[in-house]
């Protein structure tokens, strides 16, 4: 933090181009100057990336006057004002959310032209079937006549007594409430939803 750096400078532990820095007002050229702490070089980091396992009840926003946001989950040490979530998860949805200040990465992950895979785990009220797998593979017409791209549905388990299912779903787009709406289109209801993967980013 800035406060900690000031303390280190006062202790004479920071050097720029092998000269001990005496003032925290010293101007540094991040790409030209060599900065060391206890004679160990420090490397300037421009872009930051955090893979967050978002809990339910937290909103995918940078700030809100009433709700807890994903930015509130960061420690003071990790918090940066230029961070933002890549896309969003519903308030009641858990799982993978990337926080970054890298706009190019965000564009690559969110661009509809890229068809980046997003994998979800869901608990469903209702028994999913082989017919549902085929329907998802063809693409579904969800409410308001909106057509989805083909999606891969995997049925992990079925409880016939409780009439519930556990599924995984791989999407190649990101429509509003898409998983819930696709499951609803085949007559079932999502009761729990967690994102496991976005492109090459996986939950730890």
Q: Whereabouts are the PLM-identified features?
A:
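Basic, flexible Lys/Arg- and Gly-enriched helix-loop patches that mediate nucleic-acid binding at interfaces
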Residues: 2-204
